[in-house]
Regions:
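Condensing-enzyme catalytic core mediating Claisen C-C bond formation in acyl metabolism
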Residues: 1-58, 168-241, 249, 331, ...
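Short acidic, glycine/serine/threonine-rich loops at helix termini
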Residues: 20, 97-100, 131, 156-161, ...
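Acidic-glycine-rich active-site phosphate/pyrophosphate-binding loop
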Residues: 36-44, 95-110, 156-170, 219-225, ...
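Short glycine-rich phosphate-binding loop at a beta-alpha junction
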Residues: 81-89, 261-271
Length: 345
């Protein structure tokens, strides 16, 4: 798809205040590490994740989403009556019914004119929501949308630590499906999607994008809730191989739609999984690793928040500059990939 007149404004990353280093996670896993004689430092060594962030107390996804949404509206100069569509796009949600967007709407005090819905597609949700909102902007159905996401990985990480320490039947082999859980973090992200003539200076222009799906891999990473607790198991090796193969196919489609090639983007922002994933992805796509802007070393994997938060941080830190073109390479379990071409202004 090609976008003619749609931009992102007020893009923000909402970072929780509590920092958990990978060393701290391993200290909490001392019973497991001692029993299986696991070497200390392996978590950071294998992933490149030095730390991740959590909120210090339980927080509903709607509250995290609204924290980011409020800041995005302020940054974009948008009031409650200006939002025609609100999308909550994270993996985490308050409950099955009603939509988490209903709670975000109330927390932000949006007007009755705003449509609400949740878009859920694992770690790809935010990019999916942006593309859907952009399509509605381009067609004239809406003028502005607010896309929000709020992820809280703390319950998953804490449950995983407890399970790994308490289940004495686990071995070095059988702990592998739980390893990816220890890379998860928390955070929020939000942006206003609108027509370009309604946005102020500094907006990010959406140029186009492409998507690709491989549902044969839908069993490689599965998460669920059980009695208010989160559970996730991942075949990390198979997921890495299938994910990179899917990304290669999507990259080919993306280049055909946008007219870009490997030399076009000044910067590349991918879903933030870890060092090995990024290295293999850049190798297989033929991209220059020097163009990679990462946040996983300090944020871990923050689900749907990872790509928008990383883009927001790159801009805020001056690592992504006005006039530069950026390839946003998203992927989520399922497997699904979406890649968007944007230009910072």
């Amino acid at each position: 798809v090609i976008f003619q007149r749609t931009v992102l404004s007020g893009l923000v990353a909402e970072l929780p205040p509590e920092v958990w280093t990978s060393d701290e996670v391993e200290r909490r896993l001392a019973p497991l590490y001692g029993r299986l004689k696991l070497p200390e430092g392996r978590l950071e060594l294998m992933t490149g994740i030095r730390e991740r962030r959590f909120w210090p107390q339980a927080i509903r996804p709607s509250a995290a989403s609204a924290l980011a949404g409020r800041r995005a509206m302020q940054a974009a100069g948008v009031g409650p009556a200006d939002v025609d569509l609100l999308i909550h796009s994270s993996v985490c949600r308050d409950r099955l019914e009603p939509s988490t967007a209903a709670y975000v709407h109330g927390l932000l005090g949006l007007g009755p004119q705003a449509q609400i819905l949740d878009v859920s597609n694992a770690c790809l949700g935010f990019l999916n929501a942006v593309a859907l909102a952009a399509g509605m902007v381009e067609s004239g159905q809406i003028r502005r949308a607010l896309v929000c996401s709020g992820e809280d990985g703390r319950p998953l990480v804490e449950r995983t630590i407890r399970l790994l320490n308490e289940d004495l039947a686990l071995t070095r082999e059988t702990i592998k499906p739980y390893f990816a859980n220890l890379t998860i973090g928390a955070g929020g992200a939000a942006a206003v999607v609108s027509r370009d003539d309604l946005a102020g200076p500094g907006a990010i222009r959406l140029l186009g994008g492409a998507a690709e799906t491989d549902s044969s891999a839908n069993g490689l990473c599965e998460g669920d809730t059980s009695f208010a607790e989160l559970d996730m198991r991942t075949d990390s090796e198979a997921l890495l191989a299938a994910g990179v193969a899917l990304a290669q196919r999507c990259w080919g489609r993306f280049k055909g739609v946008t007219g870009w090639d490997e030399s076009t983007p000044h910067r590349v922002v991918t879903h933030q999984v870890g060092r090995r994933h990024s290295s293999l992805l850049f190798e297989k796509l033929g991209l220059d690793p020097a163009k990679d802007y990462q946040s996983f070393d300090r944020l871990g994997n923050v689900g749907s928040v990872s790509v928008p938060a990383t883009l927001a941080l790159g801009i805020a830190e001056g690592r992504i500059k006005p006039g530069e073109r950026v390839a946003l390479l998203g992927i989520g379990s399922g497997l699904a990939s979406m890649m968007l071409a944007v230009e910072c202004q």
